[in-house]
Amino acid sequence: MQNNEILKPAKYFSELEKSVLLALVEKYKYVLECKKSDARTIALKQRTWQALAHEYNSQPSVSLRDFKQLKKCWENIKARTKKIMAHERREKGKLFGPESNSHQALKEKVASMIPEQLYFVQNQPDDERGYNHDTSNQEMDCKRVSLLDLEVLIDEQGKIQTKPFRKVPETNSLCDDGSPPQSIDKAFPNGDLELLIDEQGKIQAEPIRKVPVTDSQCAQGSPSSSIKTESFVVPERDVYEDQNSIVNMHSSESSLHSTPLFPSSKISANRTYGRKPSQNGIFTKMHEEQHHQQMSILQLQLIQMNEVHVAKVQQIERECEMAEEEHRIKMEILNKKKMYWERKLQTITKEWPVASFNRPFPNSP
């Protein structure tokens, strides 16, 4: 290198150049983001990066770059996006603060290209006890809580106890024989109750005003027989109000001679929370990405096989041309030999005429 030659630093990628690079990477992402590490896949990735660099340099208003620079820039953008999104997840989990708007468009585009590397399954609520839960209803809707069936037991003293039990179909209608369902067995002596189930699973009972509820009667049941039953409503809500699930139970009035069938009443309720959007969509998208990736690899393999076939055909054509050339040269040599022997034969014929061979020898009798 000469002494007067000065090394110039590489130019930084502008926003336009980054946009062009992201568009090209999104075009070939099924090959570039493939997780395989065998020699064939690595060679395929390198050829794809070279093709991407050729397309990139053919775009207007961009600086000339080789495929190594473009690959390094894409890796830096991907690592920076992962770091930013991880930081936002931590901040959102701790403080539920607003998201940062810096590089929002670039971050969303990169996140849409590599969702399986950025999204993850949320932690269970038990792992978030140290975080601040005093948030709005919208934040509470994003919390993943598995559905839990509870069995509420109300004894004679009015005490309430809960325990999990098997899920049974809930109904407020009477059975065919006129008996009430097994989940409702006892009348409340103090009127209607309102059960409040909070996030920690604590249950509180408060008296509420009576709401008329119509129970379905069986066709075989006699109109004179009256049974004291309780009807309850478990609202299947997507949005919780003040972190409580309200269970309204109504006790209808009946005749005075009715007696409780069992010493305790069993009330089944479902703890329904606002859940975070399901991950099934993400898993489906990941399967689609894998399917498109496999289809792209198969397409590239077909292209390679076609190129090999064309190369073999060209090789056979060249061999045919070489064989024809060799045959032509051999024919020329044979023709030259033929002409040589014809000329030699003519010379011999001129020197030794045929009539001289018919004369007798001088000493012949």
UniProtKB/Swiss-Prot annotation:
Residues 301-337 form a coiled coil. It comes from the Eukaryota. Pfam families: Myb_DNA-bind_5 (PF13873). Residues 13-78 form the Myb-like domain. The keyword Coiled coil applies. InterPro entries: Myb_DNA-bind_5 (IPR028002). Keywords: Coiled coil. Belongs to the MSANTD3 family. This is Myb/SANT-like DNA-binding domain-containing protein 3. The gene is msantd3.
